[in-house]
Design a protein with these regions (language model features):
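Ligand-binding grooves and catalytic loops that recognize ribose/phosphate and carbohydrate rings
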Residues: 115, 248-249
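Internal helix-turn-beta structural module
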Residues: 148-248
């Protein structure tokens, strides 16, 4: 098995070329051994797990392995997510049972939504969304009634140099995040992991509070409603919004 460090590039093309050259050298080198011949050679046979979800990828990783975590207080859960920490953990446990019953590799709510959208905007390889969406979400109740949430992405195939990162709009999006160019791949991984954790918590909370289907039914594309217009964004709108979040301010 060939293992590479590709710096801030996703490095899929460079690793293919390097492996190919190494294998050609090996095939040439073994000719000097009498009776030893390589009958067949393929540059790829799926053992790399390229663009596939596998247990090997889950355990050993491909690309960058990154973890994000947060601690949600009871006040934050009830005020923002509209659930208690206990209800959030109970809902998560139901997802664990469902994931095991379905034979899933890893447990997450909807990481693919973040991976797909951010890969498109940031010039990443869209074909790698499948393996990069592999994730392990964990939520537990702490002794002081907080929800400790963590997510691990073991196979985030991303880069901040090369490939689609040089496209004008994608480059601009990377610059907005402060992740364009060399020495930024791990920073980008942290940003993506943070968004994945945030969306999983938000979606799980909506499901736990029975808001998920209701919101889709009310605001879905089949029922477009102009609830908010540009003209509504006046001082009064923002004053009311700020007051709802900070009533004592």
């Amino acid at each position: 098995q060939f293992i590479y460090e590709t710096g801030d590039a996703a490095g899929q093309n460079m690793t293919t070329t390097c492996t190919w050259q190494a294998c050609k050298w090996i095939m040439k080198a073994v000719r000097r051994f009498e009776g030893l011949r390589i009958k067949n050679f393929l540059i790829e046979s799926n053992l790399s797990n390229d663009k596939k979800v596998t247990y090997q990828t889950f355990l050993k990783g491909r690309g960058i392995r990154v973890m994000a975590e947060c601690l949600l207080t009871a006040e934050s859960c009830e005020k923002i997510l509209k659930v208690t920490p206990k209800l959030l953990v109970t809902a998560y446990q139901s997802f664990v049972m469902g994931s095991i019953s379905a034979g899933m590799i890893g447990i997450n709510i909807n990481v693919a939504n973040i991976i797909g959208s951010m890969f498109t905007a940031l010039g990443q390889d869209i074909a790698c969304v499948h393996e990069s969406s592999l994730a392990q979400l964990h939520i537990e109740l702490t002794e002081d009634n907080c929800a400790y949430c963590t997510i691990t992405l073991p196979s985030l195939v991303i880069g901040t140099v090369g490939g689609g990162t040089n496209l004008p709009q994608q480059r601009e999006c990377l610059e907005m995040l402060g992740c364009a160019g060399p020495n930024n791949a791990h920073k980008l991984a942290e940003v993506i992991a943070g968004f994945c954790l945030a969306l999983d918590i938000s979606t799980l909370s909506a499901i736990a509070a029975d808001h998920f289907a209701r919101a889709h039914e009310k605001l879905g594309r089949n029922r477009p409603v102009n609830y908010l217009k540009m003209g509504d964004l006046d001082n009064n709108f923002f004053n009311l919004a700020c007051h709802s979040l900070h009533p004592d301010a």
